[in-house]
Design a protein with these regions (language model features):
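Conserved ABC ATPase "signature" region
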Residues: 126-143, 252-253
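Helix-to-loop junction immediately C-terminal to a conserved catalytic motif
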Residues: 57
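Conserved ABC ATPase signature
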Residues: 148-152, 156
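ABC ATPase NBD coupling module
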Residues: 20, 74-92, 110, 118, ...
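The feature captures the beta-strand-to-loop junction immediately N-terminal to the Walker
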Residues: 42-44
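Short catalytic/signature loops enriched in Gly
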Residues: 4-5, 22, 233-280
């Protein structure tokens, strides 16, 4: 087995101008993801998850630090067709809303065919066979291939979006709240599918979520972000059994359960924010 991580983030920092100063969105973020691994990036709105995702897929350039995919630097805002295609083959993303990656005017099969053609598969029968293979991989068939996105259920659309991302055989798949809009039973089906895919292909998954239950289900490790910083990074089982940081404990307490105390949680949240502001 290779000892080179599929994906490595080292000392990432990203700021944005705001007024006369700069807002620190991500500060000193580091992690490694190996073949077949699954890392959960956990945090609420404003934690830095979205900025991190944009850096991982090359849409933003970090102010400091670097991102390596299979040992090679990931270029941001790449110019030139060949370079853009190479970046797409390194890291793909599946969004919460599959309509962001599926053209509503084109059938699912034609969408997949177009991706394969764009990435150099000129042989039509070979593309048709690969489309069938991709659809089968995500549990879809000929009926779904012929359908427009609006003719599919939410779960089927998300499966189609996953198939589209897998078409280029990326090293890493980033899933940005990819199941949060689905019913719980459909969530479980998609999460099982993702677990099967990483086992069968060795692809690395980065699962971005505010939902610790989802992270528990599919990830090996979890990295908890708060105000742009990593506050905890552990194997999922250890993090959930014995969270070390007050924010991680607050996230766990925020999940509804018998004896749930929303007012107490809100008070703890304000106290944590005040203590962090005082520390900074």
């Amino acid at each position: 087995l290779s000892t080179t991580p599929l994906l490595q983030a080292a000392g990432l920092r990203k700021t944005y101008p705001t007024g006369g100063s700069r807002l620190v969105a991500v500060e000193d973020l580091s992690f490694s993801l190996y073949a077949g691994g699954a890392l959960g990036l956990v945090g609420e709105s404003g934690s830095g998850k979205t900025t991190t995702v944009r850096m991982l897929v090359g849409l933003e350039r970090p102010d400091q630090g670097e991102i390596l995919v299979q040992g090679a630097p990931l270029a941001a805002r790449t110019r030139g067709r060949a370079a853009r295609l190479a970046r797409a083959k390194a890291v793909q993303i599946v969004f919460q809303d599959p309509y962001l990656s599926l053209d509503g005017r084109i059938s699912i099969g034609a969408t997949l065919d177009g991706v394969l053609r764009l990435h150099g598969c000129a042989d039509r029968p070979a593309r048709a066979a690969r489309v069938r293979e991709l659809l089968a991989q995500v549990g879809l068939g000929a009926r779904e291939a012929a359908a427009l996105p609006r003719g599919l259920s939410g779960g089927q659309r998300q499966r189609a979006a996953i198939a589209r991302a897998l078409a280029v055989e990326p090293a890493v798949l980033v899933l940005d709240e990819a199941v949060s809009a689905l019913d719980v039973s459909v969530q479980a089906q998609v999460l099982n599918l993702l677990s099967d895919i990483r086992r069968d292909t060795g692809i690395g998954l980065v699962f971005v979520s505010h939902d610790l239950a989802v992270v528990r289900y599919v990830c090996d490790e979890a990295l908890v972000m708060y105000r742009g910083r990593t506050v905890e990074h552990q194997p999922v089982a250890e993090l959930l059994a014995a969270p070390q940081h007050p924010y991680t404990r607050l996230l766990l307490a925020s999940v509804p359960h018998p004896g749930w105390d929303p007012e107490g949680i809100g008070r703890r949240r304000r106290e944590l924010a005040s203590s962090q502001e005082a520390a900074s």
